[in-house]
Curated annotation (Swiss-Prot):
Biological processes, Gene Ontology terms: DNA recombination; DNA repair
Gene Ontology CC, one term: Holliday junction resolvase complex
GO MF annotation terms: crossover junction DNA endonuclease activity; DNA binding; magnesium ion binding
Gene designation per UniProt: ruvC
Organism: Fervidobacterium nodosum (strain ATCC 35602 / DSM 5306 / Rt17-B1)
Name of this protein: Crossover junction endodeoxyribonuclease RuvC
Domain of life of the organism encoding this protein: Bacteria
Lineage: Bacteria, Thermotogati, Thermotogota, Thermotogae, Thermotogales
Amino acid sequence: MRILGIDPGYGIVGYGVVEKLGNKIAYVSHGAIKTEKGEHFEDRLDYIYNQVNEIIEKYNPELVAIESLYFYKNVKTAIYVGEARGVILLAIKHSNIPFVEFTPHQVKLTVTGYGRAEKTQIQKVMKILLKLNEIPKPDDAADALAIAWCAAVSGSDYSSYKKNTK
């Protein structure tokens, strides 16, 4: 099963793709969608939406795993991330692919064994788990790989998930 992990944001959206074959999880790809600070916010959202669609089309995942929103001290940041997450979920919906959500705590606990792990720890662990030559960068992409990994090892049978309907 091919799984696309997404770490939502409005400045940088991380993505990571893994393939689960039996009990093995193989690395496929990772990267980041970066938006320009000076652009109008609606243009940034449009760009994120289009890029997520392209990633879905390119990697053809059977499942998307996305990080759920967590508490932000800055309300404005939380709203922006929530809006970016909304267009990402819309792209997933239009692609007719099932998705699952994980909290940052769940992902960190699953990947490192510690629910409050630092981003650098996530990067190092993902390098080891996926047998990569280098630490995955940016850290948003490493987080996305960790989200995909979390879906792959969670033990759920996602093949029985009902696909989104258009």
